Amino acid sequence: MDRPPVPRAAQLMGARHSSWAVLSLAALLVSCEARQEPEGRVAKAPPFRIAPAATSAPVPVQNALFSLSDFQPLLTNPGLSGVAAALDAGTPGVAARELSSWLSKTPPAPGERFRYDFLLARLHEQAGEFAPALTAYARVSQGSSPLVSYARVGEARALLALGRPKEVLARSAAVSDSEPVARLKWPVLAEAARVQGDRSAAIAAYEHVLLALSAGAERAESELRLATTLLDAADIGSGDRSLQILKALSLSRRIQDEPNVPRATLLSAQAREARALGLLPEPLQAQHRERDPAEQLERVRALSDARRFALAQQAAEQSLAALPESERASSVGCEIQFLSGKALAATRAYARAGEMFETLLGQCQDPELRARAQFSAGKAAASDGQHMLAIKRFAALEQEAPKNSLADDARLYGALSYLELGVEARFTELLSALPDDYPEGDMVPEGSFRLALRRLDKQDFQGAARVLERVLGNKFSVAARAADFAGRERYFHARALAATGESERALGEYESLIRDLPLSYYMLSAYSVLHAADAERARAVLASALAAVPSGPVVVTNRAEFSGVGFARALELFGVGDLENGARELDALGLADSSRPEILWGLSKLYAEAGSVKLSHAAARRALSAAPSTWPADAWLDAWKLAYPAPFQQIVLREAKRTGQNSALIYAIMREESAFDPDAESLADAYGLMQLIVPTAKSIARPLGLPSDRASLKRPSVNITLGTGELARLANAFPENALLAIPAYNAGPGNPKRWLRERPNADFDLWVELIPYVETRRYVKRVLSSRAAYAFLYQRDDFERFAVLPSKVQ
């Protein structure tokens, strides 16, 4: 049975209802509040401990600034439930009034008042109530808390909104440029200077803004403001007029190349481009009316990198048409041709892509570019079913550039094209020689596995075992790869051993996989085979793996940053719900992008306490990938729950009951589709937690009376309801094996039905490996792994039903 839902307020605000005492900065060992685990036992040990770094002495208790055992976001206070409810309803003004009322009745301690004032100021500002926001920010800025700089910038924003730009500079002057908060002050200073007509100061401030922003809508908006200010300055002859106009022209064009820019911003950028051209003298107008070849290449590349392939192809076509014939073979012209072919292939215009690559190969001589073009031409031909042409291109790459990093890729894909043509002997010959011909090639494990898989499919188990033994003896084959590959060769080697009569050796390998790779796809595959052979033995191995997990806390290494003011600011920002700026503070400390598990676990818990499932899950997922051999037992149970969170429980459990879909599968789909980001958007125009496209959502929403527009699909209550409905519809399409709803969710129901017709009654593990779409194949493995993890963590009594995969597809 599914567990009952947690209270809605706890879901929303990250209430501290878990057992983790986490990373303490006030002591080296933190005790854990005991609570009942799902199995009804009391936690044996504190799951988180902070240990001194190996190269430093322990941090004395009296010198530590903060302790996460004392950290509690303001809105988890039960007395502020009305504030949280108003925020959830999207009414920050009501939330501000609720908070003011509560403060009048329950004054906080003097040392804590700044937190409530800062939250109050943020609520007023979000509601557009700038006068009371200014008052509340001023109370914070007059103190000495870690939030003083943020309050001063808040004052500056409020003053600007109230039409008092002259006072903005005074409020912002005390904010150090070395603090992360500085990125917030520059837009305010720029706008204040622009409003006052000080265009030079505005331009300088906007340039500061751009230094802190990467590509995206926010940067595009700042570039647009800078372009406008430059053109305004040029209009009145302030500064170097031609230089200002040309810079504005460049910015306007760059905006049009950036991904995910709102349509209104794009239209404004086009208008600024036209205005800039109009301001140029006639000779310069003619010179700059069209982008020069280098600018055209950058535009095509930007669109291609953003995977906006239709636009990239259109831009490439226009660029090539404008290029003189003599420049087609230049480095710029050749690169545009390559990107054009790549865009055509991405939009499935394979024949045209092949023609473009053929043209490039006839004109361009750069060895690296030719190798890329030959490889891409081969892949386009193979995708178009032109396997002889694909073989020709792959062979040409190997012959012309045998040392190129794509040469072993070409060998693999060429062999697969031979297999598609039924030329088994050549397929075998090419892949058998791959390890010797390309001993350092990164495709050696994959090519060898594909050879072994073919032999397994033909029931040549001895041949498969020999190939896999060679792979497992190759150090490269055990190098770090994505988690869904972990254990693949070991599992199928055991399968081959079992089929050749070495049953006990095979069963021993299955046991090792169960111990070594908890809840991974190939652990589930191994458990399923072992369970079919001896269910009690499988259960005993699982029990021993759990018993082997070390007791005691998950250790977080102490760092000097934990006692610094930057970390203190991050904690305070998380406490008042400003997750974005809190994360920036951690990033400035070099913590947010850490690859060290002991740091990531601490960050994950901090994010969870602050109420961000998205950030918490991301950090924990990275941490768990670095320690994949630790089963979720004792302290590690809560660690795994951070990597596999269960938010929106009331909605999920309601929809699971309504549709007959288990919550473990719903959460697994959600985790793999959006990583728990309600605002997620894909390049295929899929939206929200379960990544629905509008036409699919509309067909499910109509009978339920629910909206299905883009904005509504970003609301968890709508998205989960419709996504679960789609999952149920797909499961009903495969009554003999509802798990085929998983590949159907990714690739559409028609493809799994076709694959079933092509391979009826196939072994389930081989059927999954032979899914022709790489994305779908890997997706199925990840979802099955996540589904089992959710069952283990939240439905333990029912876990075995999720751990045992079907032996056949039907």
Predicted regions and their residues:
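Catalytic and substrate-binding regions of cell-wall glycan-acting enzymes that process beta-1,4-linked
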Residues: L507-I514, L689, E736, A741-R796
